[in-house]
A protein has these predicted regions:
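Structured surface interface patches that mediate subunit assembly and partner/cofactor docking
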Residues: 2-19, 44, 73-80, 114-228
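Active-site-adjacent scaffolding segments
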Residues: 2-118, 122-129
Length: 228
């Protein structure tokens, strides 16, 4: 009797359109929100990125996407030093110009990421997470959630499996089927998470989970962080 294909296994087949779809969904929600905010809101601190303001995060995101669109990946790109230079290059820009560049990047980077064979998929997930950071800084509801969450969770699951991350089975309020993350070779029993999708995203990206209700068994939160 052959092995049965589970829904979790199906996720391992890369959907090249998924990263671009995630960016487009987030663009359609985030850009109008940014354009409606007062200028001083762009100076608010972002708790998930110490030392960065909302504007810093947006400048980092727009610069990264512009690099993708223009295929500019010099040595050291996306290092902390490179990120700081990208932000500094935009110091003289208006907030509106940064938002315009971000909108263009979120629109045009998708096809480039789709054609990159998977090596840029994590960047799309990172952009979506940073959008959650901005929503969080604004006190907006739905940070690390919303319409893009299913695509973000599927991307997160595949990326953690490709990286051989610690195995975890997540029973999510937001999905009908359990989500399997991390390596599945059986070397260690999987941990288990019970809770909602935004909290799982926070755990995997090192964001604070203060006040969130969830269960995490068999693995420590610090072991989940894909950016750690």
């Amino acid at each position: 009797m052959g092995s049965m294909t589970t829904p979790a296994d199906v996720h391992d087949v890369r959907d090249p359109e998924q990263p671009g779809r995630l960016l487009a969904i987030e663009r359609d929600g985030l850009i109008p929100l940014l354009r409606a905010r007062a200028e001083e809101d762009f100076a608010l601190p972002v708790g998930a990125c110490p030392g960065w303001s909302v504007r810093s995060v947006l400048a980092h995101c727009s610069a990264a996407l512009t690099r993708v669109v223009e295929n500019r990946f010099e040595d050291g790109v996306f290092s902390p030093e490179s990120n700081d230079r990208d932000i500094a290059e935009r110091d003289g820009w208006s907030n509106a110009r940064v938002v315009d560049e971000l909108e263009r990047g979120m629109t045009e980077a998708g096809p480039v990421i789709a054609g990159a064979g998977g090596k840029l998929d994590g960047l799309a997930l990172g952009e979506w997470v940073h959008a959650g950071d901005v929503r969080d800084a604004f006190g907006e509801p739905g940070a690390y959630g919303g319409a893009g969450l299913p695509d973000a969770l599927a991307l997160l699951a595949r990326i953690t499996r490709e990286r051989g991350h610690v195995p975890l089975h997540a029973d999510l309020d937001d999905l009908d089927e359990p989500l399997r993350l991390g390596e599945s070779g059986g070397e260690r029993p999987p941990g288990r998470f019970i809770g909602d999708g935004p909290t799982l995203v926070r755990l995997y990206t090192g964001r604070p989970v203060d006040g969130a209700e969830f269960e995490l068994v068999g693995v420590e939160a610090k072991d989940l962080n894909i950016f750690g």
